[in-house]
């Protein structure tokens, strides 16, 4: 692991255990947020809804073993558990995991509760039918993201679903323009990834693309790839 990658992980963990936790808890919740944050909330929810719809449409979600890698506050884990999946959610932030546990207890009561744990993605073990990693790769450069994807692929018996910020000319220009305006929310680095690079990493790990999706709002862009073992 490079020092740069280690720095990124440290930045992400510390941010989401401090000021970032309150900010993103509001964004992923239903409280008052500003215009940009509300747009990000809508975009993230659209990505979650797309993935849940895929799994529900397959017709075998009840009892399916799913790993939600980088679960945040449980935005994906909870609806999957509601639909009957056996969900193991992990996040690098202890505070995020605590919030996810609290939300699951409130929403699911005594129903099918997800299992949440505080873990770096590189420490994840076990085997799952489906491994899902949404809105995480944006925090890491392609070199580190490649290692993460390869590790997640090793945990997936059948399917791996990823989302990432696509690296296109238009979005790169928007990102550079945004970087000209300083703000308190720019605490973590934001990395875009070429879709061809992500597809190659998946292919090198024995996966082929089954379904794709794209979420685009004013301030949120997320490419979704569902890959299955070839």
UniProtKB/Swiss-Prot annotation:
GO terms for molecular function: magnesium protoporphyrin IX methyltransferase activity; methyltransferase activity. InterPro entries: Mg_prot_MeTrfase (IPR010251), Mg_prot_MeTrfase_C (IPR010940), SAM-dependent_MTases_sf (IPR029063). Pathway: Porphyrin-containing compound metabolism; chlorophyll biosynthesis (light-independent). It catalyses: Mg-protoporphyrin IX + S-adenosyl-L-methionine = Mg-protoporphyrin IX 13-monomethyl ester + S-adenosyl-L-homocysteine. It comes from the Bacteria. Its EC number is 2.1.1.11. GO terms for biological process: light-independent chlorophyll biosynthetic process; methylation; photosynthesis. Disulfide bonds: none annotated. It is an enzyme of class 2 (transferase). Keywords: Chlorophyll biosynthesis, Methyltransferase, Photosynthesis, S-adenosyl-L-methionine, Transferase. Gene3D superfamilies: Vaccinia Virus protein VP39. The keyword Protein transport does not apply. Belongs to the class I-like SAM-binding methyltransferase superfamily. Magnesium protoporphyrin O-methyltransferase family. Converts Mg-protoporphyrin IX to Mg-protoporphyrin IX methylester using S-adenosyl-L-methionine as a cofactor. This is Magnesium-protoporphyrin O-methyltransferase. It comes from Synechocystis sp. (strain ATCC 27184 / PCC 6803 / Kazusa).
């Amino acid at each position: 692991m490079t020092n740069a990658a280690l720095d990124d992980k440290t930045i992400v963990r510390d941010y989401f255990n401090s000021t970032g936790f309150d900010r993103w808890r509001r964004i992923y919740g239903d409280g008052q947020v500003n215009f940009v944050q509300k747009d990000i909330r809508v975009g993230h929810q659209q990505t979650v809804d797309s993935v849940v719809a895929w799994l529900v449409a397959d017709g075998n979600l009840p009892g399916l073993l799913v790993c939600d890698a980088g679960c945040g506050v449980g935005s994906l884990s909870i609806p999957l558990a509601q639909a009957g999946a056996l969900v193991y959610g992990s996040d690098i932030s202890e505070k995020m995991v605590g919030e996810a546990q609290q939300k699951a207890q409130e929403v699911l009561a005594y129903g099918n509760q997800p299992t949440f744990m505080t873990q770096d993605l590189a420490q994840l073990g076990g085997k799952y039918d489906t491994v899902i990693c949404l809105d995480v790769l944006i925090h890491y450069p392609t070199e580190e993201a490649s290692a993460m994807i390869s590790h997640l692929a090793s945990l997936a018996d059948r399917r791996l679903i990823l989302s990432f910020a696509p690296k296109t000319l238009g979005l790169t220009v928007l990102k550079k323009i945004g970087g000209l305006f300083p703000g308190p929310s720019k605490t973590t680095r934001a990395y875009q990834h070429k879709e061809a690079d992500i597809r190659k990493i998946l292919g090198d790990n024995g996966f082929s693309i089954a379904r794709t999706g794209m979420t685009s709002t004013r301030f949120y862009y997320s490419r979704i790839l569902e890959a299955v073992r070839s």
